[in-house]
Amino acid sequence: MKRNTDLDLIRAILIILMILIHIVSFGNAYPHLKAGILSFMMPTFLIITGYLVNIEKTGRQMRNYLKCLALPYVIMVTGFSVLSYYMPVRDGITELSLSQIGEKIFITSIGPYWFIQTMIICGTLYYFSFRGRNWNDLHKNYTKRDTYASLFVFALTLLLISETPALSASAAAYYFIGVVIRQSKTEWSKLFRHEFFAIFLWIYLLYRDDWYDWGNLAI
């Protein structure tokens, strides 16, 4: 897939917004605006992530990709978990033990690191759901029916895992949307066009706090 400058711009804007909402003074001064930004920022990140993940890789390449996610994830979650024992952190550990730290790493996660955990879980399921294809003959033999079957398997595994504390159903849904866009061979710039009036829809979204729930696909 060719580099998409539109996606680069969107990700840059989202990163700036992420930095902004984590400034304590901004959140205290504009709590409603912060909640509005959060309502679309992470769902957009998840859709883009699902769209950009490349599963046309060998097993070794995919392992390297997952390792690059898992290693910093384990380090950061471990450090944050230990810190949460000594400081008032939401959903922190109550006992400094391997079992509680292991629970944070492998099941519930902690702090902002849930996003990396979601990337690892969804990326792994995505890859293995489509792993039946022969990458060397990808464009010759893999039919639309095969793609639909793989998407069904992927959706089913996401649904099952989302019944556990390890994966949020809404996060899985947004990731899946990105995957569907990618597998449909639809170009991002053709699906999401530049329209000036979109800024008015964005302002309206910020005004409608009843749409802040991720479960509302109006996001």
Set out the residue ranges of the language-model regions.
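Alpha-helical transmembrane segments and their immediate juxtamembrane cytosolic regions
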Residues: 1-219
